[in-house]
Regions:
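Positively charged, small/polar-rich N-terminal and surface patches that mediate targeting and assembly
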Residues: 1-106
Length: 106
């Protein structure tokens, strides 16, 4: 089964570095890194705003919890927004591709 993870990063370089690490560790099959977005948020009871870089990571569902834990460890934010879910539907070729992710770790 295919799983996706959404996570914003402080900048492009950080997203690329962490994405490369997760690829090398065979935890993900792909990271799509977007352009800058404007974020408005509440943190520690105060309103804030800033620029972030969104990323969508693709993995196999059996690795979802491991990817989230590793991403949280690598991420520079104190409490990064990491949202993961199992896909209800995907192309069969996508399932086959991501089924091979992490196979050498098992």
């Amino acid at each position: 089964m295919t799983a996706l993870i959404y996570c914003p990063f402080p900048d492009q370089g950080t997203a690329e570095k962490i994405g490369a690490t997760l690829l090398e560790e065979e935890l993900i099959g792909c990271i799509n890194i977007g352009g800058s977005i404007r974020s408005l948020f509440v943190w520690n009871g105060e309103r804030g705003e800033g620029t972030e870089v969104p990323a969508l990571l693709k993995t196999h569902a059996r690795l979802l919890d491991s990817v989230i834990a590793r991403l949280e460890h690598l991420h520079p934010y104190e409490a990064p927004a990491i949202l993961g879910w199992i896909c209800d539907a995907a192309a069969p070729t996508t399932h086959v591709w991501l089924d091979g992710i992490g196979a050498s770790r098992e």
